[in-house]
Regions:
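Charged, low-complexity intrinsically disordered terminal segments
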Residues: 16-169, 173-393
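Bacterial N-terminal signal peptides
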Residues: 4-14
Length: 393
């Protein structure tokens, strides 16, 4: 009772608006893999046996954005996207505009974004969601909107519930191709920021693993914490959509210099697709994802699933994570793997390459334990170009 009274006071003092608590959620599910179109043809040319997955690393920033644009430009049935961050900058607007164009062609687009770093007004999100083929959902939004004071107050009162964030990052098109990895959507993830850029890696995937990824997306999309974008502002109207689309077009025109390496309109990417069969690695793939946490706190920890997969490794286990803080259970699993002759390698960020010093400070406490478990531990340099220059000199 006291918490409710305090929350009401914060709302009044902050001059806040609040979200309706229980909006209508339409349940939807993944569409079967497309049987025609450029993406289906490209996937079929890989000639993958049943149960097999093809994977290609996307380490270069421009290539990572190229492939996202290429998949969207050739989509014919569905696009399912899930990200922690989607920024309203050049990269974010370029890709968002292409998604709108795909929806115009009749492609069903579902976009799920976490609320914590949401970059866009509630009203605009609702307007975009009025498109008949385009729906946005916001993961675990705070009820208090348009007020920093109110938002902080709500977070303090309901920390446990609002601290449950969605860091997942996936991009599935026509249920034939998927992109997974460390990149969110924004300039720093694609080498376009004038301040700093992140070094990330994605995997382009085709084959047996893609329907698994789509089914995992459905669990988040239909979860009780996924809030319908159309309900973010009930007054939003589809009549506002053309004007919002013009704003996107004007933004892209004004920032064309930053985006000079990318086509501003849909184009044919078949020359890019032709190179794929020679570049992919073929094998068995596992997709791991924690389940969406419900309000009652039920959850399945990703580290437990990693332990399970690690137990199946026979020769080598490689873990790559910018933020690596192992549990005791994972350390025991690593030691057990090493004792059976499995080579375990771990790559994480150094202090200089990490954008969260608090996380790195906590990780440092585990260095000796990781090495004692028998793993090879590597930290990514913040200045790899300097090292390369020293070698070439």
């Amino acid at each position: 009772m006291i918490r409710i009274l305090v929350f009401s006071f914060v709302v009044m003092v902050g001059g806040c608006t609040t979200l309706q608590p229980d909006p209508v959620r339409n349940i939807s599910h993944t569409i079967p893999p497309a049987s025609s179109g450029a993406l289906a043809e490209t996937a079929d040319k890989l000639r993958l046996p049943p149960g097999v997955t093809a994977a290609m690393p996307l380490s270069a920033a421009q290539e990572a954005l190229d492939w996202r644009l290429a998949l969207v430009d050739h989509a014919i049935t569905s696009i399912d996207i899930q990200y922690f961050i989607w920024s309203s900058d050049e990269a974010g607007i370029l890709l968002f505009d292409r998604l709108m164009q795909a929806a115009d062609r009749g492609v069903r687009v579902r976009l799920l974004v976490d609320d914590l770093a949401l970059d866009g007004s509630d009203h605009n999100i609702a307007v975009y969601s009025r498109h008949p083929n385009f729906e946005i959902r916001i993961y675990n939004p705070g009820r208090v909107r348009k007020s920093a004071l109110g938002g902080i107050g709500e977070f303090m009162l309901y920390f446990r519930a609002l601290n449950r964030r969605m860091h997942n990052k996936l991009f599935v098109v026509d249920n034939r191709f998927a992109i997974l990895g460390g990149r969110n959507i924004g300039n720093p993830y694609f080498g376009l920021s004038k301040k700093y850029n992140n070094r990330d890696m994605d995997l382009l995937l085709a084959g047996a693993i893609v329907p698994e990824i789509s089914q995992a997306f459905d669990k988040y999309w239909n979860a009780e914490l996924a809030y319908p974008g159309g309900a973010m502002s009930p007054s939003a109207s589809i009549e506002e959509l053309p004007e919002r689309r013009k704003v996107l077009e004007m933004y892209l025109e004004q920032h064309s210099e930053t985006l000079s390496s990318y086509p501003m309109q849909r184009q044919d990417w078949k020359n890019l697709f032709k190179l794929l069969p020679q570049r992919v690695d073929i094998g068995k793939g596992h997709f791991l994802q924690d389940i969406p946490v419900s309000h009652d706190g039920r959850e399945l920890k990703l580290v437990d699933m990693i332990d399970q997969i690690a137990g199946e490794s026979h020769e080598e286990l490689i873990l790559v994570s910018p933020y690596f803080i192992p549990t005791e259970g994972l350390l025991e699993s690593i030691a057990e793997q090493v004792s059976r002759g499995v080579k375990v390698k771990i790559l994480t960020g150094s202090l200089g390459s990490n954008n969260h010093t608090a996380v790195h400070s906590h990780y440092r406490k585990y260095r000796r334990k990781i090495l004692a478990a028998g793993a090879e531990l590597y930290e990514f340099r913040h200045d790899p170009s300097e090292h390369i220059r020293a070698i070439s000199d």
